[in-house]
Amino acid sequence: MIIYLDFDGTVVEHQYPAIGAENPHAFRVIRALQVKGHHIILNTYRADINDGSLAEALDYLNSPTNGLLPITEHTARKIHPGPFDLTESLRFEKLYIDDIAEEIPLIPNRMIANGFMVDWATVEHALIQADIL
């Protein structure tokens, strides 16, 4: 399955242009998806801005301390995510993990008042239930 992975608010907390703190459980679940054979493509608004922030995000993801397999692909521009619907994701072999995807579980962002980020623990449970993970 192709998984389009957002960065800010998904892998890390919202802090753009800086890179925010790691979103709890993100790297563990992303690594499990990679090990299961899913193809991860970075899909971020950082691709729309020519300020070096896309390269910074890729460098961050590929840091050896994060334990991920290399993520080298990214969309040329941000693709607006479809809803977090695992039945449809299985049908079409693509999944969007993105804090702006409809129906994706969210938790409060610790750094921005009234902000939210992906709830990776709940996402992981849903992926296991759908036999994606």
Language model regions located:
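C-terminal cap/substrate-recognition subdomain and adjoining C-terminal extension
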Residues: H39, G52-L133
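Alpha-helical substrate-recognition element adjacent to the catalytic core
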Residues: M1-R77, P81-D85
